[in-house]
Amino acid sequence: MSLYINIKDTIYANLAKAALEAQKAGELSFESLPNYVLEEPREKQHGDWATNLAMVLTKQARKAPRDIATILIKHLDTEGTFITASEIAGPGFINFRLDPNWLTGVIPEVLNLEADYGKVNLGQGKKVQVEFVSANPTGLLHMGNARGAALGDSLAALLAMAGYEVSREFYINDAGNQIYNFALSLEARYLQLMGQDVPFPEGGYHGEDLIDTVKGLIEKVGNKYLNVDQDLRREFLVRYALEEKLTSIRETLTDMGVHYDCWFSEQSLHDSGFVKDTMEKLEQQGYIYEKEGAQWLKSTLFGDEKDEVVVRGNGTPTYFAADIAYHRNKFERGFDRVINIWGADHHGHVARMKGAMSALGYDPENLQIILMQLVRLIQNGEVVRMSKRSGQYITLRELMDEVGKDAARFFFIMRDPDSTVEFDLDLAKAESSDNPVYYVQYAHARLCSILRQAAEQGYNTAGIPQEGELKRLQSNEERELLKKIAELPNEIEVAARLTEPHRLARYVLDLAGLFHSFYNSQRVLVDEEGLREARLGLVRSTKQVLANVLGILGVTAPERM
């Protein structure tokens, strides 16, 4: 357990013990301790920690909050802790002040744990699956896919850091109507490029990339599929194009630093009979009925506005039917928790999917769906809607070519998924402190530069400073930097519990800012050995923490810039 979390847990435990002692002494009356908050005050003059326990006990204890706070402080045992003072503030908050020397333990902790610093055991080894991107394999990755990639991969890394066993998954939509339309589109382009005057199907895929795919195919097979059975031709065209598109998707995501443990085929659910079996199970449970020749799921039971068709009149399952089967399959694979990242336009699908899982006997609370809002690209102060290269939507590949992988990932992960991302292309390329990813990476490069200079001057850059040396770190800039470093394990735990990796982007920006303030006010390589050793330990710890958090976010930590 980290030093920071240990201190926090100690205060929690001592508060609970004080309340029980007061109850035993007849000074406080309550049935059970209510949920209360222990957090760092926004104003530094209010101490290191503050709790609202006295205020939330008022209703049960039938006393004024400040009177309850006085009683709690009276029974608070702080011996053997870092607590040096307990004070009542405002309407009844209790503020705690800690011995400043508690921070001396932070640097040895970081330097001993290295890449493991920040790890917590919130998940206790539970199996979590994160499914994200899952783009249609009929085209190229767009901005919505890009945001989902950054969010999903960072969330998976965060959960792994928090003690979960995590599996990343991409669901391949290689079945259903969209693949049929894809086949018709490919066939039309093939025949057109072979000189035949055929119409393009209504609702077909018009992308230039599809034409490029067919041109590449013709270079390999020529007119071999011109005068063959239509079904054979379509089957070949789809198989060829899907393989090419999926290869492109894999390569683009790999270049973004995103890797998957499983690529799961929708078609495999149909081929194995699992979709049919799932619909039969729902029918046996009384959740499916027939109307107008089709089979309908009673999704209104789950809060939907209307029931949904799951099997069409011609006997073919809908995409929703396959999706229900897919989610059943996830739970059958033994995942304790399943997380999906979807575009906000799928919000109407959430209640019915959770309801379907409930109907199949699974706890819907174990299915979490995170909805993402749109991405707007901005250049020269204006919204960019089309690619200059293709005249169509801008692809993830084009974005990375323009601003690089690191800027793409950081800009997408900075915002809460529920907020629209305004991606400023000019800012993402700027080499200035206004560019958040540059600001953070520059901090890491500057830390590396200090350590190189120290090594060149023959100073020790490998050992762990002694406690007496670390007590020399007394400036405000040093203390604030140490406190921020100490917070990382707690920040990991909170971000993982809330499934909010964007909190870590905020954390690393704050850490970089505190380091830059320290750098501008304190010289590291001073003549006094004890102070120099302590500051070098602080530099190494800051560098390690920056690298750890950037690693979760999938952003490189450069040694030189």
Swiss-Prot record:
It holds the Pfam family DALR_1. It catalyses: tRNA(Arg) + L-arginine + ATP = L-arginyl-tRNA(Arg) + AMP + diphosphate. A motif ('HIGH' region) lies at residues 135-145. PROSITE patterns: AA_TRNA_LIGASE_I. One of its GO terms (cellular component) is cytoplasm. Keywords: Aminoacyl-tRNA synthetase, ATP-binding, Cytoplasm, Ligase, Nucleotide-binding, Protein biosynthesis. It is found in: Cytoplasm. Its EC number is 6.1.1.19. Its main location: cytoplasm. It comes from the Bacteria. It is an enzyme of class 6 (ligase). SMART domains: Arg_tRNA_synt_N, DALR_1. One of its GO terms (molecular function) is ATP binding. Transmembrane segments: none annotated. Belongs to the class-I aminoacyl-tRNA synthetase family. NCBIfam families: argS (TIGR00456). This is Arginine--tRNA ligase. It comes from Desulfitobacterium hafniense (strain Y51). The lineage of its organism: Bacteria, Bacillati, Bacillota, Clostridia, Eubacteriales.
